[in-house]
Design a protein with these regions (language model features):
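Sec/Tat signal peptide C-region and signal peptidase I cleavage site
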Residues: 16-20
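Hinge/cleft segment of the Venus flytrap/periplasmic-binding protein
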Residues: 21-66, 202-205, 317-375
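Extracytoplasmic "Venus flytrap"
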Residues: 38-59, 69-88, 92, 96, ...
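An alpha-beta-alpha
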Residues: 70, 89, 180-227, 231-233, ...
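Hydrophobic alpha-helical segments within soluble ligand-binding/sensing domains
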Residues: 114, 169-195, 212, 242-244, ...
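Hydrophobic alpha-helical
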Residues: 124, 128-148, 217, 235-298
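Flexible loop/hinge segments that line or gate small-molecule binding clefts
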Residues: 136-175, 189, 197, 292-305
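Flexible loop/turn connectors
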Residues: 280-348
Length: 375
C-alpha cells in the first residue's frame, strides 16, 4: 500500500473531520457530460448515442453552505463494489459538510425493500435522493413520487429508464462488456487461438448494468477477428454462494470446451473455486466486468486475469458532489448524464494502477452514515 492509501485508511478509521476534508479532496475525474435533448426513456448508452457529448474533468465541489441531507439507496452491501461506493460517498460527505445516509436494500431480489427505502426517504424529507436502481423500470414510479414531493433524484452506477431523474452518474454499461470481452479476444490472439468458447456470469437479470455487460460482450464477439462462441449465460443475484453454484453448472455442461468465464464483481471471484475443484485451473481463464479491491488482489495473485473498471469510488464522488452543486444552485446548464471514463486492469499494469479512483483503501470499514453535526 502506498503512503497516500495508507493515510486514507488511517483517516477512515479515526474519522477526524478536519483531516478528512484535506485528504478526501480528489483529483479531477475524466468524464463525458451528456446534454439534452436525448432519447426519451432511454439508458445512459442511449443518451451517449443521442445527446450532445462534452468530454472534460469533474472537479471537487466547494464546501456546502448548509447541512444538506442526502439519502443514498444502494441495492445491497454484499460485495466490495458497494463498499467502494460507500467509501466515496462518506469521505466526500465529510469534506463537503453534508449529511449522507446510505440505505441499502437486501439484494437484487429485494425490489420491494428498495421501494420501501424510497418511501422512507421521501417521508423523511431528505433534501436529495441518490438511487442505484435495482430495476431498469420498476423504480420509475417511486422516482416520480420523490420528484412530485419536491425532492431532486439522482442516479448512481446502476442505470434506469426513468425520465424523472435530475441527473444520471454512471459509466457506459455497454462498454463494460465490450472492454472486458475485447481484452479476452486480445489475450486469445496472443495465445494463438483461432476460436474461443466463453461463458458469462453477468449478475441478476433485469439490472441495467447486467444488460449492458451482455450487450457489450455480444457486440465485441460480433466484431472480433476470431470466432467467439458464447456457450452459456447464467443470471442470478451476485451473492457468492449462488454464483458458485451457477459456475458449477456451467462447468458441468461446458467445462471441457470452455476457454474463458467473464463475470461481475461478485460473480468472477465465485467462479474460481469451482474451476479449481473441477480441474480446469490451467485451462479456463476468468475475467471480470468490473473492479473491486478483492478482484485487484486476485489479479495480482494471477487468479483473475483482468477486469474492466467502472471506477465506483469516482462515480460515488461525482454523485454526491453533483447533488450538492444541484442543491446549492451552482452551474448554468445541468447535464442529463455524466459518464465516468472506464479503466482496464490486468497483470501488466497492476503495479502502476490508480486504485484510489476505483476501490476503497485496504482495510476500510464500511460506514453507512455521516452527520457533520455529530463530529
Amino acid at each position: 500500500m502506498n503512503k497516500t492509501r495508507l493515510f486514507l485508511s488511517l483517516l477512515a478509521a479515526c474519522g477526524a473531520p478536519a483531516l478528512a476534508q484535506q485528504a478526501a479532496r480528489f483529483a479531477p475525474i475524466p468524464v463525458m457530460s451528456i446534454f439534452r435533448p436525448v432519447q426519451p426513456n432511454g439508458t445512459a448508452d442511449d443518451a451517449l448515442a443521442s445527446g450532445r457529448v462534452v468530454p472534460g474533468l469533474y472537479a471537487p465541489a466547494a464546501h456546502a453552505s448548509k447541512r444538506w441531507r442526502i439519502a443514498f439507496l444502494f441495492p445491497h452491501m454484499k460485495d466490495p463494489y458497494w463498499s467502494g461506493c460507500a467509501y466515496g460517498v462518506i469521505s466526500e460527505a465529510r469534506r463537503l459538510g453534508v449529511v449522507a445516509d446510505i440505505l441499502p436494500a437486501a439484494g437484487y431480489d429485494d425490489l420491494k425493500g428498495q421501494l420501501q427505502k424510497m418511501d422512507e426517504a421521501i417521508a423523511a424529507k431528505y433534501d436529495a435522493i441518490v438511487i442505484s436502481p435495482i430495476s431498469m423500470t420498476a423504480n420509475n414510479n417511486s422516482i416520480a413520487r420523490a420528484r412530485a414531493a419536491g425532492i431532486p433524484v439522482l442516479e448512481l452506477a446502476n442505470d434506469s429508464r426513468s425520465d424523472d431523474l435530475n441527473l444520471k452518474v454512471t459509466t457506459s454499461l455497454r462498454a463494460m462488456g465490450t472492454e472486458a470481452t475485447r481484452w479476452v479476444i486480445r489475450d486469445a490472439q496472443q495465445r494463438g487461438l483461432k476460436s474461443i468458447n466463453i461463458a458469462l456470469l453477468p449478475g441478476p437479470m433485469g439490472a441495467g448494468w447486467v444488460k449492458g455487460e451482455v450487450d457489450g460482450t455480444r457486440i465485441a464477439a460480433q466484431e472480433a477477428p476470431l470466432e467467439v462462441n458464447i456457450l452459456d449465460i447464467r443470471y442470478g443475484d451476485s451473492e457468492r454462494g449462488l454464483q458458485s453454484q451457477l459456475a458449477g453448472r456451467i462447468l458441468q455442461r461446458h467445462g471441457n470446451r470452455l476457454d474463458y468465464i467473464i463475470g461481475c464483481t461478485g460473480c468472477a471471484p465465485a467462479a474460481l473455486a469451482p474451476i479449481r475443484a473441477a480441474g480446469y485451473g490451467d485451462k479456463i481463464r476468468v475475467v471480470a466486468y468490473d473492479l473491486t479491491g478483492e478482484i485487484a488482489h486476485l489479479i495480482r495473485s494471477k487468479e483473475i486475469y483482468a477486469a474492466a473498471d467502472t471506477k465506483g469510488v469516482s462515480q460515488a464522488r461525482v454523485a454526491i458532489n453533483a447533488a450538492v452543486n444541484l442543491l446549492e444552485g451552482r452551474g448554468k446548464e445541468q447535464p442529463h448524464t455524466i459518464l465516468i471514463k472506464l479503466g482496464m486492469l490486468d497483470q501488466q499494469n497492476a503495479g502502476s494502477y490508480p486504485f484510489d479512483t476505483s476501490v476503497a483503501p485496504d482495510g476500510y470499514k464500511v460506514v453507512l452514515s455521516h452527520d457533520p453535526a455529530k463530529d
